[in-house]
Swiss-Prot record:
Binding positions (ATP): G446, P447, P448, N449, T450, G451, K452, S453
Listed EC numbers: 5.6.2.4
GO cellular component, one term: host cell nucleus
Motif Nuclear localization signal, chain ranges: 79-81
Gene: E1
Protein name per the record: Replication protein E1
SF3 helicase domain segment(s): 420-570
Subcellular localization: Host nucleus
Length: 618
């Protein structure tokens, strides 16, 4: 150590710290002061610092516990997503539980454990215990109400109510699944679906779930009165009971009627009944019913349906191989008077259940072609037949299709009501039917609502005439109907129509041959048939149509057509009254006697295109 008196101008290097006694004493005094400050019992902040030894603990166990809790939470989330919700209480249980809180704990069957704990099951406040005795007295009454509710579900199903069907949102899907499990065949494979409950059908397939064996005899008794054929089968398994009925009713019934019949007979709800018509054109469905009918466990009554026999029996299979013949279809349309393609197609398709040729027609892929050819051939035959007939023969043929019992006086009274001289009208009408030159057109004019169109239309309807309309005059084919009729009508002719007639149809009014342009054919020369015209214009009073005055015969209707208090016409201009009119004035109209014409060696024989079927022996 250097002396303290060393000169400060030189460098000074400190190698060791110098210790002095006075510094040590100062540190000791400071430590004593610090200890005395924090160790006094009077201090409120004693033991402020925790200087005890610290331990790390088991952090790995804590992490494992947290990870386990997270995994359990994820697993519960997946279970809630993929598993069904807990079963809900049924309507019967809810009704019973609502009677009393204590009644819920009393049941006949075994109860399922609840998911939650029941807390405070016994209240020792004294109030609940005082009410317990009164509620126990009403237990028998509540149980009796519970039994009544169960019995109201139906006698046929109360013994085997399935929880899965009662709780299923789609009852029909559940019934279809149970039907397939019980029978082994899908219900939709045996039936075809009717969306409307009002649609009627003769045959119905009925499947009733949950019917006991005692109710089967009721079905046999009730259905036997209303059915021509009945197939009853009771399918039993460990889980399901199905009653299957194939019923052929005497009259067509809708689904609503069938459901009402079954519910009233078996005392079951309509939710447990499936009713659809059978697939009568399915070979597989027909074979199923045929094979099941041979089982001793199946009750059958009545004759086998035709649709089933045609697809299962051998003789029907051989008969179904018949090919379609167009001549038979044309013969049928000709005999029934069908000339429109839509009518021919519709009514011949309906005939398929009875006629083999119609059945072959439905099985063909060229139905549209056959219908078109049939309509065309019938039109040709009808036109040729009409052309070969005289006016007397045509009227006689048309009147044969009308019933008897008319009164000719209605027509005569109507003509007198319109102030038309009856003798003059009969002369003009006779000349019109005979086609006398210059007398081939009959005009009826007058104010509106006098019955002009009604009078002419009724006559045209009974004679099967045709109408031409001036609205089609821009077409060159608007006169084509004149080539295929015996009498025609131009209704409500206006001034442009009379101008057209004055320019182009003078020779037609004369009754001379005219040339008519036909569609898809060359122009054809025909004799214009008798023509009736209704109009509000008096042609003979106008000089501009002076060349038509000698070619037409006019009658004026002056009075408005009368109606009774019910809105019905006062004069009945019907087909039967026109038939009576022609029969009464047949000779006055110079119509020939058809019986004399047949005796002259010209028998009226209907057209025969195919051999008639031999009549069955009596």
């Amino acid at each position: 150590m250097t002396d303290r008196g060393t000169n400060n101008d030189d460098w000074y290097i400190v190698d060791e710290a110098e210790c002095r006694d006075d510094d040590e004493s100062e540190l000791e005094d400071l430590e004593d002061t610090y200890n005395s400050l924090f160790n006094r019992s009077e201090s409120d902040i004693s033991d402020l610092l925790d200087d005890t030894q610290q331990s790390q603990g088991n952090s790995l166990e804590l992490f494992h516990l947290q990870e386990h809790l997270q995994n359990e939470q994820d697993l519960n989330t997946l279970k809630r997503k993929y598993l069904n919700s807990p079963p809900q209480a049924s309507a019967t249980e809810t009704a019973c539980n609502s009677l009393s809180p204590r009644l819920e704990s009393i049941t006949i069957s075994q109860r399922e454990k609840k998911a939650r704990k029941q807390l405070f099951t016994q209240n020792d406040s004294g109030i609940e215990l005082s009410l317990c005795q009164d509620e126990v007295d009403n237990i028998n009454e509540a149980l009796q109400e519970q039994v009544d509710i169960v019995q109201s579900l139906g006698g046929g199903v109360r013994d085997c109510i399935g929880v899965d069907i009662l709780k299923c949102s789609n009852t029909r899907s559940a019934l279809l699944a149970k039907f397939k499990d019980t029978v082994g065949v899908s219900f939709t494979d045996l039936t075809r679906a009717y969306k409307n409950n009002k649609t009627c059908c003769s045959y119905w397939v009925i499947a009733v779930w949950g019917v006991t064996s005692t109710s089967v005899d009721v079905v046999k008794t009730v259905f036997q009165v209303q059915c021509n054929y009945m197939h009853v089968e009771h399918c039993l398994t460990e889980k399901n009971k199905f009653l299957i009925v194939l019923a052929g009713f005497k009259a067509q019934k809708s689904r609503e009627t069938v459901l009402n019949l079954v519910t009233s007979s078996l005392n079951v709800q309509s939710n447990y009944i499936m009713a659809e018509p059978p697939k009568n054109r399915s070979m597989a469905a027909a074979l199923y019913w045929y094979r099941r009918s041979m089982s001793p466990a199946v009750y059958t009554w009545g004759e086998m349906p035709d649709w089933m026999a045609q697809q299962t029996l051998l003789n029907h299979q051989l008969a179904s191989e018949k090919h379609f013949e167009l001549s038979q279809m044309v013969q049928w349309a000709y005999d029934n008077g069908y000339t429109d393609e839509s009518d021919i197609a519709y009514y011949y398709a309906i005939l398929a259940e009875e006629d083999e040729n119609a059945k072959a027609f439905l099985a063909s892929n060229a139905q549209a072609k056959y219908v078109k050819d049939c309509a065309r051939m019938v039109s040709h035959y009808k036109r040729a037949e009409m052309s070969s007939m005289s006016m007397s023969a045509w009227i006689y043929k048309r009147l044969e299709e009308v019933e008897n019992g008319g009164d000719w006086k209605h027509i005569v009274k109507f003509l007198r009501f319109q102030e038309v001289e009856f003798i003059s009208f009969m002369i003009a009408f006779k000349e019109l039917l005979s086609g006398k030159p210059k007398k081939n057109c009959l005009v009826i004019y007058g104010p509106p609502n006098t019955g002009k169109s009604m009078f002419c239309m009724s006559l045209l309807r009974v004679l099967k005439g045709k109408v031409i309309s001036y609205v089609n005059s821009k077409s060159q084919f608007w006169l084509q109907p004149l080539a295929s009729t015996k009498i025609a009508l131009l209704d409500d002719a206006t001034k442009p129509a009379w101008d057209y007639i004055d320019l182009f149809l003078r020779n037609a009014l004369d009754g001379n041959p005219i040339c008519v342009d036909l569609k898809h054919k060359a122009p054809q020369q025909i004799k214009c048939p008798p023509l009736m015209i209704t109009s509000n214009i008096n042609v003979k009073a106008d000089v501009c149509w002076m060349y038509l005055h000698s070619r037409i015969t006019c009658f004026e209707f002056k009075q408005p057509f009368p109606f009774d208090e019910n809105g019905q016409p006062a004069f009945s201009l019907t087909d039967i009254n026109w038939k009576s009119f022609f029969e009464r004035f047949w000779s006055q109209l110079d119509l020939s006697d058809q019986e004399d014409e047949e005796s002259d060696g010209k028998p009226q024989q209907p057209l025969r295109l195919a051999t008639r079927a031999a009549s069955n022996s009596i």
